[in-house]
Amino acid sequence: MKLWDILATCLLLLSSVSTRPLFHKLQPSKRAVVRSESPALDPIIDSQPETSNPKQASMEEQYDLTGLYPEQFEDVMDFIEATLGRLRRSSDVEPQMKRDRVRQKAAANTEKSGGRGRGERKRSRGRARSRDDRVKGQGRGCLLKEIHLNVTDLDLGYRTKEELIFRYCSGPCHDAETNYDKILNNLTHNKKLDKDTPSRTCCRPIAFDDDISFLDDSLEYHTLKKHSAKKCACV
């Protein structure tokens, strides 16, 4: 579109030059000759040249105009050639700029896709490690488990249809036993200690869930505290 706009402008300039009146550039000597010679003619003969003088003047003006056109045409043609040269250079530069922009976009997309790929690989490795940790945790003994129950199933004397998730600690603590626990177990087994000796290390909660409140069948509110385990350990 830029090329056609500039060409249209050049054509308008060319047409304006071709139709522009150039009477102010006419040579005054020819008009002076016509005026100086006309009074010397005979009155009888003078009537006819008066009718032919406008034609003769117009032919002279036309002759002068055609003499002036080549210089103006040369200026306009020089302007058009210079404009076309600039357009050719700009048309050669624009495809190169477009190719550079395409390369830059492709490189940016490659970097983004590479970054996403690295992030996905890191996340997959993290998920794999978490699965391994869960598998290893299952073999360590003391674990946090959960079960879905009704509040009435807790046998705390409440009659309600409310439900909750009960979490509890379960599993052996052989790996967590110290020499103290081993000695205590051996002495108890050999009956060298009384039966009221504290029991061995067991899996118990070391943190509890938040308190819960519920409405029983008698429309009374109750609150349970330290009812469910949140974190377990061998103690």
UniProtKB/Swiss-Prot annotation:
Disulfide bonds join 142-203, 169-232, 173-234. The keyword Glycoprotein applies. Its main location: secreted. Neurotrophic factor that enhances survival and morphological differentiation of dopaminergic neurons and increases their high-affinity dopamine uptake. Acts by binding to its coreceptor, GFRA1, leading to autophosphorylation and activation of the RET receptor. Belongs to the TGF-beta family. GDNF subfamily. First expressed at 14 hours post-fertilization (hpf) in the ventral half of anterior somites and in intermediate mesoderm. Ventral somitic expression persists and extends more posteriorly over the next 12 hours. Expressed throughout the ventral trunk mesoderm and endoderm at 24 hpf. By 30 hpf, somitic expression ceases and by 36 hpf, expression becomes restricted to the endodermal cells forming the gut, with expression along the whole length of the developing gut tube at 72 hpf. One of its GO terms (cellular component) is extracellular region. Residues 34-60, 91-137 are annotated as: Disordered. Residues 20-87 form a propeptide. Residues 119-128 have a biased composition (Basic residues). The keyword Ribosomal protein does not apply. InterPro entries: Cystine-knot_cytokine, GDNF, GDNF_fam, GDNF_TGF-b-like, TGF-b_C. This is Glial cell line-derived neurotrophic factor. It is found in: Secreted. The gene is gdnf. One of its GO terms (molecular function) is receptor tyrosine kinase binding. One of its GO terms (biological process) is sympathetic nervous system development.
